[in-house]
C-alpha cells in the first residue's frame, strides 16, 4: 500500500504542475500589468494629480458615492439573498436569472437602459423633479445597479451555507421570525456581509460604462476616478491617467485587504 501511494503521488505530479503553470500565468499577467504601471509612473505624476482640484473632487465623490452605494446594495442584498436561499417558489429560476442580468450585461447597456428609463418613460417626471440623470444621483444609481448584483450573489451563497437549524431552534424557543433573523441569522452571516460590502465598494469604485452614459463625464459634477482616467486620456495626459489608475488600485487593495 505504501508503495502504491508513492507511485500515485508521483503520477499526480504532472497534473499539479499543469495547474500551477496555468495559475502562475494568470497571476503573473495581473502582476505584470501592475508592475508596468508602477514602472511608468513617477512620484511627480502623483504630486500633479493630487494638486489638481478636479482630481481631488473625483476622489471625494468616489469615496462618498461608493460608500452610499455599498449601504444601499446591502440593504437590498440581505433580504433578496435570504429569500432566494430559504424560500422555494414558482418562477425562482427566472428571478435568479434576472438578478444576474447586471453581471452579464455590457456596462454601457446598463447605463443606456437607465438613461432611457429616466428620460423616455413616465419616470421622466421624477428625473425632472429630483435631477437624477447627469447629476450625482445618477452616479450612485449606476454604481448600485451593478454592485448590488454582486452583493446579492455573495449573500445568497452565505445564507446557503448557513444551516437553518439554529434559526429553527430560536423559533421553538419563542423568537419571532424577525427576531430569529436579526439575532441568529445575521450574526452568523457577518463574514458574508463583510465580503459583500467589500466587493460592492470595490466594484463601485471601478464602475465606468454606466456612469459615462447615465451620469456623463462633467468635471466638478459627475467625475469619479474612472471618469478621471478617461478624461486624462482624452487630453493626452497618459502620465496623469496612469497615476489615477494606480491610485484606484491602491484604494481597492486597501479595502479588499483591510
PLM region spans:
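Membrane-helix/interface signature in polytopic inner-membrane proteins
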Residues: 156-167, 177
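Core catalytic ATP-binding domain of two-component histidine kinases
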Residues: 179-181
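Membrane-water interface segments at the C-terminal ends of transmembrane alpha-helices
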Residues: 10-44, 53-160, 184, 188-209, ...
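Glycine-rich helix-loop "coupling/hinge" segments at transmembrane-helix boundaries
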Residues: 210-238
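Glycine/proline-centered hinge or cleavage motifs at structural transition points of membrane proteins
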Residues: 173-174, 187
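Short coil/turn motifs that cap or connect alpha-helices
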Residues: 90, 175-177
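Short, Lys/Arg-rich, polar N-terminal cytosolic tail immediately upstream
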Residues: 1-13
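Short hydrophobic faces within alpha-helices
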Residues: 101, 165-173, 241
Amino acid at each position: 500500500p505504501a508503495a502504491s501511494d508513492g507511485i500515485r503521488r508521483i503520477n499526480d505530479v504532472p497534473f499539479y504542475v499543469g495547474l500551477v503553470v496555468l495559475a502562475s500565468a494568470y497571476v503573473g499577467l495581473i502582476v505584470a500589468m501592475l508592475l508596468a504601471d508602477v514602472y511608468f509612473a513617477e512620484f511627480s505624476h502623483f504630486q500633479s494629480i493630487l494638486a489638481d482640484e478636479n482630481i481631488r473632487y473625483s476622489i471625494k465623490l468616489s469615496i462618498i458615492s461608493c460608500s452610499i452605494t455599498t449601504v444601499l446594495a446591502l440593504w437590498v442584498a440581505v433580504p433578496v439573498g435570504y429569500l432566494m436561499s430559504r424560500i422555494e417558489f414558482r418562477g425562482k429560476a427566472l428571478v435568479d436569472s434576472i438578478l444576474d442580468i447586471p453581471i452579464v450585461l455590457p456596462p454601457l447597456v446598463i447605463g443606456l437602459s437607465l438613461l432611457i428609463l429616466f428620460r423616455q418613460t413616465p419616470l421622466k417626471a421624477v428625473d425632472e423633479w429630483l435631477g437624477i440623470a447627469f447629476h450625482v444621483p445618477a452616479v450612485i444609481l449606476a454604481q448600485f445597479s451593478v454592485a448590488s448584483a454582486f452583493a446579492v450573489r455573495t449573500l445568497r451563497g452565505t445564507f446557503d451555507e448557513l444551516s437553518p437549524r439554529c434559526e429553527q431552534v430560536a423559533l421553538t424557543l419563542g423568537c419571532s421570525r424577525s427576531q430569529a433573523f436579526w439575532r441568529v441569522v445575521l450574526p452568523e452571516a457577518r463574514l458574508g456581509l463583510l465580503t459583500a460590502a467589500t466587493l460592492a465598494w470595490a466594484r463601485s469604485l471601478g464602475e465606468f460604462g454606466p456612469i459615462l452614459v447615465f451620469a456623463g463625464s462633467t468635471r466638478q459634477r459627475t467625475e469619479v476616478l474612472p471618469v478621471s482616467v478617461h478624461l486624462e486620456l482624452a487630453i493626452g495626459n497618459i502620465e496623469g491617467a496612469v497615476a489615477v489608475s494606480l491610485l484606484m488600485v491602491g484604494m481597492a487593495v486597501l479595502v479588499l485587504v483591510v
